A protein has these predicted regions:
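Nucleotide phosphate-binding/pyrophosphate-handling subdomain across enzymes
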Residues: 4-114
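Active-site catalytic pocket residues across diverse enzymes, especially alpha/beta-hydrolases
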Residues: 31, 82, 135, 159, ...
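C-terminal helical cap/extension that packs against the catalytic core
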Residues: 63-64, 105-164
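Short glycine-/acidic-enriched loop or helix-start segments at secondary-structure transitions
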Residues: 75-76, 102-104, 127-128, 176-179
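Glycine-rich beta-strand-to-loop/alpha-helix junction loops that act as flexible
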Residues: 94-97, 167-171
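Surface-exposed, flexible loop/turn segments at secondary-structure boundaries
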Residues: 98-100, 123, 150, 173
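Glycine/aspartate-rich loop-and-adjacent alpha/beta segment that forms the canonical ThDP
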Residues: 170-186
Length: 186
């Protein structure tokens, strides 16, 4: 039973993290980790471990979120969470790699979004034009971009402060974006 931790702040924000949270709490208690250490660990998991890209907020006006969800299982959770975001326009910076079930993921993507199809800088990346063509099969419309940062910049340029920009589809896409953002600020 993890009820005693219900009010505890968990730094990882994705809806899917609730399942992970329960598993972590159970394991921590079995290992005899103190309540204080559990609370501190839950509140500072990203800072402590360096974990990034899990429903990570990058901006607020517009709301910008990135997530490394990259397969059908992850997108079952992400699609639900994205649908709950209140915004005027949902803008999806999206790319995938070649060993994932593109059809299964595409079927879960929001139909009412504007897409900025992209590709990460890895040999495994599916080209943005191939992803765009696959997206059209699912009624998803957008423009292809040769790299993540140009797709991201285009989405930000087009976005109003009341829009939502999501970056994801692949861990590589999120890594490319976060690397460029870090390089820009250091």
């Amino acid at each position: 039973n993890t009820d005693e931790y219900d009010g505890i702040e968990f730094e990882l924000k994705g809806n899917y993290q609730q399942k992970n949270r329960s598993t972590i709490l159970c394991a921590a208690r079995q290992l005899g980790i103190s309540r204080e250490s559990i609370i501190k660990g839950m509140a500072t998991v990203c800072e402590t471990t360096g974990l990034t890209g899990r429903w990570q907020t990058l901006g607020t006006q517009p709301l910008v979120i990135c997530d490394t969800g990259h397969n059908a299982g992850g997108w079952q959770y992400l699609a639900e969470q994205i649908s709950q975001v209140e915004c005027d326009t949902c803008r999806m910076v999206f790319g995938m790699v070649d060993d994932k079930d593109m059809d299964a993921v595409m079927a879960m993507l929001p139909k009412n979004a504007t897409y900025y199809w992209t590709q990460a800088e890895t040999k495994r990346a599916v080209s943005s034009t191939v992803i765009m063509a696959k997206g059209k099969e699912y009624g998803l419309n957008g423009t292809p971009y040769p790299d993540v940062i140009s797709a991201y910049r285009a989405a930000l340029t087009d976005a109003a402060s009341t829009d939502f920009v999501f970056v994801g589809g692949s861990s590589y896409v999120v890594a490319d974006l976060l690397t460029r953002i870090i390089q820009k600020t250091t």
